[in-house]
């Protein structure tokens, strides 16, 4: 240090200069001209869809065409997909993910072309090697279904006097298939519900890790396609870390279409002004194995990249990505940016939507370049737009057929059908795995509520690879008087799940997994694809959306060749209840995928740990009050939400939900809410319902009416502090002459599945007009539907004053939420005292409305 006190230190600056090296790749032999012709036909077909339906996307799908065609037709030996168009959902096929979902017209076009090639070859030869089930295939008639609903398509031909038109004869096979605006997992080879928010791509890490965990052959892979704008989203940014953390290696291969063009503007130079925003370096910095291409609209470069990924070292556990420069609005018939007739090619964000008028100048220029290439002539396109619906449909189908007639030229259709059969025959029906692909372990009867061990037990777990054995203690039910909160039971139910299913319950939670008590659920520690494939606890960062997406990726896979049986894993992701909305969007998309899936998939779980106002202890402000209620925002019957208050509710309630989900494909999500504090385990011998498995019924009676006294109404309780304090207040309320029925609300979804006689005995519909609620939740979402008009006025909720709580100690927060014992006593006492007046008010209101 100098005399005046100054000093110098050394700091370091990171450079933004690119560090990319060139390497030569031996281009494999492949049918380039065939791929180019299929690519041109694909582009023309998707443009016909846009032209006649006047909707959809144009620039992105055309930019994707070389990626999609090459990945499907280059062949497994060159790094292309191993798939079978005839059995598109075969469990042992490679997974293709059109994550950039609005680009799906390029796949609809390609799938129609493939379906037509096989259908024509089968018709010509009668050889069943070319037979594809029309129920799964796509055909020319499906061009009428682009962006139309299934209901409308059932009557579209009759409504337009086309039912008997020769052009529409194909509809008689199985109708017209609805082609959605974004990619969905129902679509042939596609295995993702894709969209522009990056949600689709984010599940890819879980899909890849699933194969490693199942001990599958390393040749099985995931190929996912997305664009650079979607990959700026939070989901996909977290996906970068997810894939690296799971060390998926070359099993995961992303093809990035980089054209610096979004919906409205450019990314670099507009959204990001500085040209230092370098995508390849970003992915490399995250730990990915990055390949860049100067022109990903060139088939040689795309196939070279696919081959390079295929030949890469399997010991390199970095996931792989190709950052390929494309042209949004790419057109194979354009020359130096010009189309026939001196029309300038439309590219970049201006080409995003299909915005050209029907049969307008630009469409005609595109069509003429196709006509010149293949020697065909489209009908009616030079006569202007078609306003009559019947004539428009006729012209659409006519010109789709003309475009597809290219398959009959120069042996293109023969080549394509043979190529599809050749690739399809490489899908292995008997893939070696470390697990039985024919048995669903979640149907094991040891998981039924009635068969759960009611006492603490020690089981012997055996490592399925090494044969090592170890004792595991599991306590699904605690003794009354023990001091344990509901969160303490979470690891116990996961341990039992993994013991019974032999390590098929996967945990994907952040580095607070110990805090939310999922840590010991894995019997064999952390998963690693090289050193510990039977571990079920994944290393994960604090990435709620990414973790949930990875969990969904796991559950979306199945080993079963029977589409009605799921053989795979279930998964759980969790965090503090306040943060779980970050997990909602991936699970919302998952719910729809589960609903529509052509094959059974697994069950995804969300743990809303530290829920309720109790989370705000230690003066924290992240309350789990409103946030966990997003898990009610699903179609009824597709999610089971469990809100536990007592340790002994957890196993009974959860395994009741699991029993349903394992047998009802509609249920794809189970949500569990647990609070942070430890409470004394309740003595159920003092309850009206003494059944130790009462939580399995959803709602159960803690205190029933005294039959010898006037009834004062029903108190429905949900949440930990609320119910614990209510139960402890009951003796004082009884001394005060209060005669209420107290119902514990664990899960309305479970309650709704009980016999009508049980529901009427616990909470009949009429009782809802004489009901108050005590809950750690809010007045915005009640634990039971159909509450009476005065329920809100008399209930206790954490948002009683419509304000955010301020935090403090646990006691401070509960008092502020008006869920302390004194507040509960006063509220229930008032509810009882005003019973007659309350009922009279409702009767008067009803009579007044009726008069």
Q: Can you describe what each PLM-predicted range is?
A:
Residues 39-55, 257:
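N-terminal capping segment at the start of a domain
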Residues 80-85, 211-223, 556-582, 602-604, ...:
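Glycine-rich phosphate/pyrophosphate-binding loops
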Residues 124-127, 131-133, 137, 359-362, ...:
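N-terminal leader/propeptide and maturation segments of large enzyme subunits in energy/redox metabolism
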């Amino acid at each position: 240090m100098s005399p005046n006190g100054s000093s110098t230190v050394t700091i370091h600056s990171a450079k933004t200069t690119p560090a990319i090296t060139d390497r030569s790749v031996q281009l494999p032999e492949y049918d380039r001209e065939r791929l180019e012709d299929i690519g041109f036909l694909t582009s023309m077909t998707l443009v016909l869809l846009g032209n006649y339906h006047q909707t959809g996307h144009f620039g992105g799908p055309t930019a994707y065409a070389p990626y999609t065609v090459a990945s499907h037709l280059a062949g497994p030996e060159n790094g292309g997909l191993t798939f079978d168009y005839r059995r598109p959902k075969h469990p042992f096929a490679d997974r293709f993910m059109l994550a950039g979902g609005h680009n799906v017209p390029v796949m609809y076009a390609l799938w129609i072309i493939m379906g037509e090639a096989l259908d024509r070859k089968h018709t010509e030869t009668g050889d069943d090697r070319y037979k594809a089930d029309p129920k799964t295939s796509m055909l020319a008639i499906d061009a009428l279904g682009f962006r139309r609903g299934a209901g409308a398509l059932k009557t579209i031909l009759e409504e337009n006097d086309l039912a008997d038109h020769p052009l529409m004869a194909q509809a008689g096979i199985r109708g017209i298939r609805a082609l959605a605006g974004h990619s969905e997992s129902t679509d042939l080879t596609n295995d993702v519900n894709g969209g522009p928010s990056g949600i689709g791509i984010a599940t890819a890490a879980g899909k890849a890790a699933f194969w490693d965990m199942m001990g599958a052959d390393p040749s099985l892979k995931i190929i996912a396609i997305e664009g650079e704008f979607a990959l700026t989203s939070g989901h996909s940014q977290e996906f970068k870390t997810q894939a690296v953390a799971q060390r998926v290696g070359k099993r995961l291969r992303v093809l990035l279409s980089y054209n610096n063009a979004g919906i409205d503007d450019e990314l670099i130079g507009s959204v990001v002004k500085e040209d230092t925003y370098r995508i390849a370096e970003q992915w490399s910095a995250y730990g990915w194995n990055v390949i860049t291409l100067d022109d990903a609209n060139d088939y040689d470069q795309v196939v070279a990249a696919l081959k390079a990924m295929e030949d890469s070292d399997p010991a390199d556990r970095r996931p792989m990505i190709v950052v390929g420069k494309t042209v949004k609005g790419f057109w194979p018939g354009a020359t130096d940016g010009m189309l026939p007739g001196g029309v300038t090619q439309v590219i970049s964000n201006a080409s995003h939507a299909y915005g050209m008028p029907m049969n307008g100048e630009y469409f005609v220029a595109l069509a003429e370049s196709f006509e010149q290439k293949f020697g065909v002539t489209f009908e009616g396109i030079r006569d202007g737009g078609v306003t009559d619906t019947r004539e428009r449909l006729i012209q659409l189908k006519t010109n789709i057929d003309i475009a597809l007639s290219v398959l009959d030229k120069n042996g293109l259709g023969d080549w394509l059908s043979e190529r599809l059969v050749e690739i399809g025959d490489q899908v292995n029906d008997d893939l070696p795995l470390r697990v039985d692909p024919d048995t669903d372990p979640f149907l094991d009867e040891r998981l039924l509520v009635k068969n759960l061990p009611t006492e603490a037990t020690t089981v012997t777990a055996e490592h399925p690879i090494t044969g090592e054995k170890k004792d595991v203690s599991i306590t699904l039910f605690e003794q009354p008087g023990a001091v344990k909160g509901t969160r303490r039971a979470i690891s116990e139910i996961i341990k039992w799940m993994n013991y019974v299913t032999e390590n098929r319950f996967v945990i994907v939670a952040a580095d607070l997994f110990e805090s939310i008590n999922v840590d010991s659920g894995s019997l064999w520690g952390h998963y690693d694809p090289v050193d510990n494939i039977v571990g079920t606890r994944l290393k994960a960062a604090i990435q709620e959306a990414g973790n949930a997406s990875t969990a969904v990726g796991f559950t979306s896979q199945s080993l079963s060749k029977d589409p009605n049986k799921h053989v795979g894993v279930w998964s759980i992701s969790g965090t503090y209840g306040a943060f779980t909305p970050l997990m909602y969007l991936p699970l919302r998309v998952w719910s729809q995928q589960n609903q529509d899936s052509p094959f059974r998939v697994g069950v995804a779980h969300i743990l809303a740990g530290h829920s309720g106002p109790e989370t705000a202890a230690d003066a924290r402000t992240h309350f789990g009050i409103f946030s966990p209620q997003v898990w009610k925002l699903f179609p009824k019957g597709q999610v089971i939400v469990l809100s536990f208050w007592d340790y002994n509710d957890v196993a009974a309630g959860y395994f009741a939900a699991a029993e349903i989900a394992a047998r009802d494909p509609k249920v794809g999500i189970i949500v569990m809410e647990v609070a942070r504090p430890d409470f004394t385990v309740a003595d159920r011998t003092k309850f009206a319902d003494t059944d130790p498995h009462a939580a399995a019924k959803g709602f159960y009676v803690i205190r029933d009416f005294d039959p010898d006294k006037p009834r004062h109404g029903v108190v429905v309780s949900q949440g930990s502090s609320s119910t614990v304090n209510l139960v402890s207040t009951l003796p004082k309320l009884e001394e005060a002459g209060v005669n209420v029925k107290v119902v514990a609300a664990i899960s309305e979804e479970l309650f709704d599945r009980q016999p009508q006689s049980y529901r009427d005995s616990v909470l009949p519909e009429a009782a809802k007009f004489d009901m108050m609620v005590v809950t750690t939740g809010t007045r915005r979402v009640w634990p039971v539907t159909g509450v009476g008009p005065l329920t809100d006025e008399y209930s206790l909720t954490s948002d009683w004053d419509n304000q955010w709580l301020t935090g403090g100690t646990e006691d401070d927060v509960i008092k502020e939420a008006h869920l302390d014992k004194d507040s509960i006593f006063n509220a229930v006492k008032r509810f009882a005292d005003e019973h007659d007046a309350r009922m009279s008010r409702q009767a008067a209101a009803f009579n007044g409305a009726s008069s």
